[in-house]
Amino acid sequence: MGAKIEDKAQPGSGAAKTPRTPRGERTLRKILDAAREEFGERGFADSSIVGITQRAGVALGTFYTYFDSKEALFQALVRDMSAQVRETVGPAFRGARDALDAERRALELFLRFARDHRDIYRIIDESEFVDPSAYREHYETTATRIAARLRDARERGEVARDLSDKDLEVFAWASMGANVFLGLRYSVWDSADPKRVADVANRLLRKGLAE
């Protein structure tokens, strides 16, 4: 499960209280899924705990078994959706020809995910104002993972060895930014072949515009 689970939720921590049974885990999952729909459709300000519990099919009191507030739920949801993205693109790194092929496959999987979870854009964007730390964490951890993969690729000779760690960090942020807006353009605003989009973007990564 993508939500960050701890023994006790602290105000503003974005943590859900620990489910102690499989049934509790399923209930927490229902609340998170209902929150994604509610926040995605109505936005944070216009969403309500009552609306979320009605969507989830749980009692109002059940909500407070897991979360202290709407803000705490939103924070947990942002981290949960970040975890879902990680889990979705994970298979891209198994069996890829090289690091850049893995990035191509990861982008294709992300584009498919974004097409099926279009509300992720509204939720992540709103988190900049509702929970700036979660918003920053979402992007920083993503870029950090990309940069780490590129450093490993440099050691294998799959990207230029003269690129410094700082260079690869810049590349990681540029790559992530491109992926975010490709998802917005070709999965949210319009529907395009994810493989085709990923192939074209990967060509830019491999060769640039000059070749």
Language model features by range: what are they?
Residues 1-42, 49-55, 72:
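Basic, helix-initiating cap at the start of DNA-binding domains
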Residues 61:
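Key DNA-contact positions within bacterial/archaeal DNA-binding proteins
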Residues 76, 87-119, 165, 171-175, ...:
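Hydrophobic alpha-helical connector segments
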Residues 102, 111-133, 181-188:
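Amphipathic alpha-helical segments used for helix-helix packing
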